[in-house]
Amino acid sequence: MTDEYESYEAVVVGCGPGGAAAAATLARNGVETLVLERGVEAGSKNVSGGVLYAEESAPYTIDDLFPEIRERATERPITKNYIHNIAGQKVKTVDITELHHHDTAWADSVLRRTMDGWLEDQVHALTSETGGGLLTEIHVTGLLREDGEIVGVRTEELDPIRADLIVAADGVNSELARDAGLMDWEEPEEWFQGVKAVVDMPADVIAERFGIDDDEGEAHLFSGDLYDGVRGGGFLYTNRNSLSIGNVFHLDSIVAERAEVSELLDALLTHPLLGRWLGEEYRELEYSAKLVPDSKKVAHPEPHQGRMVLVGDAAGQMQAQGPIIKGMNHAVSAGGLAAEAFVEARSRGNPGKVGDRYEAKLRQSGVMDALRPTAYETTRAVTEHEGLTSLAGSVAQSSVGRLALRSMGGVVERLYNSPRLLSMLPDTRLPYVTLPTVLAEELGERVATTNDVEPPALDERIGDLTYDVGEPHITVQDESWEASGAAVTACPVSATDFGGGCYRAETVSENGSETRVVSLDTQPCIECGTCAVVADTEWEHPAGGKGVAFDQG
């Protein structure tokens, strides 16, 4: 029996935007709420590109719940947005600010350690008023069950805790979602991987190089041929005193191309176009990475089981449709709606109905349609058909296709700024590589700037991170190259000819034959979860407060 365990009305696991939104809404409605955060501080385990959107149509925005957040915890308002289509040293830039502002009340660049750390203080104050609170360095390992029913959570550091509501806001690598059988990590095509460098740049230098004031900021996105055919693209966001520069790629494409993701980041950082903004004084503050769910494929339509609900990345709620990525805003909406559903169910004397109410609210509010757009579902059979995609690529690269692109130069910007068109964008090379490259070749201009940036080597990037190394938290189940070799290149802190990362290729001689195998060292792990998808591993988080701690996020 579990009656002797400590009990709360609600337990929220994770204090990112989704968990913070849920906890704040619960506490403001008088619900006794305990928040459990795995990091030494909220944000120390979190990574985002990232731009936090507040959508006009959203049921909740983060400033609804935390009115001072923009003044206290975000970086810069992102007021302009551009996409740069690249072919060698030719670039065709398209202004997509109209798309950026579509349904947008505001959008700010953020660094997660700063923002989530501030949210932690607000959430702790709110939940303490209702008999709860917030604890850091607590690793929630799974669900507490009684007679097969979910009744609470288990942790590595504390006795089990009972709760009437469990909000799993524990991120893309959610152990609660996996324990419940609601999410899995089986298919690389269902995930993206983001890799980022935070680059030091004083505010006055940002103002000069980007031509912006203190209350302005820019987003720059990159696609085309600079990534050797890997599907995805790059980003640059202006922060107050730094730049966030990185890439987001389809994980299956990284695996198929055996691409080394740190080298793909360097390809962006050293492109002549970025010489416009980066100088010889280039200095990286932090290197980071994370796994990103592709919501149109994995956003769970029924993100609940018993008294547990999933919010944010744990539920696959990350919208990457076209060049603009939205995730934190959907996590906020989901967290608020989950709390709202519990308050309503409790008031009717049936808190066990929270999941059904939450699911209905996600649909009725339009959140699920944004995450899993109908336009994509109805067109993907055609737009992602292998034969048709190959034909379209051939036509685009032909003389006829190039002539058509040149003749419609003035229409390109309108197409890029169409939310409807971008909601149908297929997951193929055509929109990520082929068309941007041809567009740059036919309509682009040669970059006049030079770029003298010399990015740090991978060992330097790892060496600059903060770790409190605990016990190994990943084991390789099948060390054969066929089963787990993809991790050697896909892992952001590993590479084929680098011996200081997590994954290494080794040749074992036995009975006169040689076999290629994979070995693992979890010490430099940045807990992105990539190897859980691309290799045969048993993966869990480190103990609370152990492992990597991001200073920027």
What is each PLM-predicted segment?
Residues 41, 122-274:
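Predominantly flavin-linked oxidoreductase catalytic cores and closely associated redox partners
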Residues 5-8, 156-165, 304-307:
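Core beta-strand elements of the Rossmann-like FAD/NAD(P) dinucleotide-binding domain
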Residues 100-121, 254-260:
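Short beta-strand to alpha-helix junction loop
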Residues 29, 39-88:
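N-terminal FAD cofactor-binding segment of flavoenzymes
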Residues 485-513, 519-553:
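Iron-sulfur cluster-binding cysteine motifs and their immediate structural context
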Residues 227-230, 240, 253-336, 347-360, ...:
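FAD/FMN-dependent oxidoreductases across multiple families
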Residues 5-35:
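N-terminal Rossmann-like FAD-binding beta1-loop-alpha1 element of flavoenzymes
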Residues 343-454:
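C-terminal helical "tail/cap" subdomain of flavin- and related membrane-associated enzymes
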